Amino acid sequence: ALRGHNLDYLAWLGNASVLRDGGNLYSGNETYGYGPVWMFVLRFADLAQNIFSENRQVFRLVIILVLTTFDLMIAIFIAKKFSLVVGLLFFVNPISVIITGYHNQFDNLAVLVGIGAILVISEAEFGNRQKTLWFGLALIGLSLAVKQVLLFYPIWLFFRAGTLRQRLTRVAVPYVIYLACFAPWATSIERIKIIVEEIFLQRRGRSGILLNLAGADYAGTIHGATYSDLARQIIFAAWIIGVFAFGWIMRNRSIIHSLVVYLVVMLAFAPAYSQQQLILPLLAVFIYATTELKIFYVVTLIFMVQNSDELGIEFFFPFVFRLNGTIYAWLQVLLIIFSLRM
């Protein structure tokens, strides 16, 4: 926190101000672009700030404490399911600390709710309890309403054994709950268009390996190519096909391990991604600890420390670890190697 903060924190301040005045973050005039759950965290932090109005750091401290609590709960899950030592290592690992304490991003909340969903679904399938299963599927929808980290995971659940009705239910319930979470703001056709535009159609992140191979720059633009739009569509389709293919491969594995691998695959084949999403493979890093994942962790940590969007402390080949380079693609190569080994 002594290093300052990422620009996302300034966005949170602006979002909280809009909410304080009774405004709508899905009006088309605000920079938000996330599901509705996070705005309640921002409102809570803003209310806490009002109590301690003389200390202007309370808002950020509350956000950091909330995000740290999410990290702790994920660590507790790892400790109980795998190893206490691994859980402790996850909780204190510097990458999570940077994303939570400096960047103040909340992918960990989406992952945490997803973990809760998987635990509930696993218990429901073991005891053949339909209502419990529906609750677990609803939690996946809630996770999507935080961030779209588990966007394709219902398809992975569809591939798992069961009757056609059971498999269709696994797909339908999460998406219905996810869409229902937007109901209070989707009050007109125009508002629905704005939500779709901000949540699904905004171009975000830096180019991954597939876009790099197509000749795109770090922002995803393929300069001087007449096939730019077609190339992006093909790459997007390849991402979806790749994620679905691994869902089929993982259909007979335990549901907990399938989630861990899903988080890796989702990032490994993404056309573009933001650096806060580099926390998604961390569950696999600490649970499986394969050679390529260890290398991924070390390279990611060096990148987090050096790049200007995070700590900005340059000490080791800064040209290689710059934001507008190919580091995003090389990190994906390591994740693809792990995915293919699974």
Question: What would you call each of these model-derived segments?
Answer:
Residues S207-Y218:
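Extracytosolic (periplasmic/ER-lumenal) interhelical loops and adjacent juxtamembrane/interface segments
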